Design a protein with these regions (language model features):
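Active-site beta-loop-alpha junctions of metal-dependent nucleic acid enzymes
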Residues: 78, 82, 99-124
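Short conserved beta-strand segments at catalytic cores or DNA/RNA-binding microdomains
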Residues: 62, 75-76, 81-98, 103
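C-terminal domain-tail junction helix/linker
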Residues: 186-252
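Short catalytic-loop micro-motif centered on adjacent basic/acidic residues
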Residues: 99, 131-136
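Basic, flexible linker segments flanking DNA-binding modules
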Residues: 3-62
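RNase H-like two-metal-ion nuclease catalytic core shared by retroviral integrases
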Residues: 135-137, 144-150, 159-183, 191-203
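Structured nucleic-acid-interacting core domains from mobile-element enzymes and related host factors
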Residues: 60-70
Length: 252
């Protein structure tokens, strides 16, 4: 290695590409090494941001009577995007946050969620609940049809994307993620999460009163502003104030 001006990994790469006369069997240590797995990322749909930028959202709001926005994001555990994640949906009009447990941060899992929502709620209710969706440029979100037309038929909603490196544009959801981190601190593995645990966590978070809501809870406002079908589908229930517990042992 001292006579070759390259690192060990580069040398092994040259052997694989047959740039040198030696073969892998001549290198016992090389044979024992496992190849690194390349991360499989979802590729963006070409032109996915056309007419869907944050500036387009502001223009749309200025000319539209409907300003109900649902913010969308993903919260990762210790396993990152390849491990279990939480898909989060935040209704600005009442601060209600929905949580969905996904096996990983992949587009097919996000699609499954929105296919389910459309199937269970029906096109009209889906369109009323999600008139505008605002999300970031995460690879699992870069196909607008996942949200606008989950069953690949009529366009039911409009999706817009934040500017790169501008998570503040959906800052209310980012702020609301703090409630999740009270229960699942950063660095916590999501491997032991179940739908039942996620639902329990969601109900405790949505039953927490907020000063920004004049002392009301997101659950209370959601009963007034959101369709009852959604409340039933997500098994949303109020937790008494004296039983709210936003700590890790809630889901132990």
């Amino acid at each position: 290695m001292e006579d070759i001006p390259c690192c060990q990994r580069t040398l092994y790469s040259y052997v694989d590409k047959q740039y040198l006369s030696v073969i892998n069997l001549d290198l016992p240590r090389k044979v024992r090494y496992k190849k690194r797995k390349k991360k499989q990322l979802d590729t963006p749909v070409p032109g996915y941001r056309k007419n869907r930028t944050y500036r387009d959202l502001l223009d749309f709001l200025a000319s539209s009577h409907d300003s109900s926005i649902v913010e969308l994001d993903v919260v990762e555990g210790a396993g990152g995007k390849s491990g279990p994640v939480l898909l989060t949906l935040f209704f600005r009009n009442c601060s209600l946050m929905l949580l969905f447990l996904l096996p990983g941060d992949r587009r097919k899992y996000v699609q499954d969620v929105f296919d389910l929502l459309l199937s269970e709620l029906g096109p009209q209710t889906y369109s009323q609940l999600f008139p505008i969706i605002l999300t970031d440029n995460g690879s699992s979100f870069l196909d607008p049809s996942l949200f606008e037309m989950p069953h690949r038929q009529d366009v039911l909603t409009k999706v817009f994307y934040c500017d790169p490196m501008s998570s503040w544009q959906k800052g209310r959801l980012e702020k609301n993620h703090e409630f999740i981190r009270y229960i699942l601190p950063k660095g916590t593995s999501f491997d032991s999460l179940t739908e039942q645990k996620v639902n329990l966590m969601m109900n405790h978070i949505n039953s927490t009163a907020r000063a920004s809501l004049n002392g009301c809870t997101p659950f209370q406002l959601a009963l007034l502003l959101l369709d009852a079908k959604l409340m039933s589908l997500m098994d949303l229930r109020s937790v008494p104030a004296d039983q709210i517990h936003l700590k890790p042992d809630l889901i132990k």
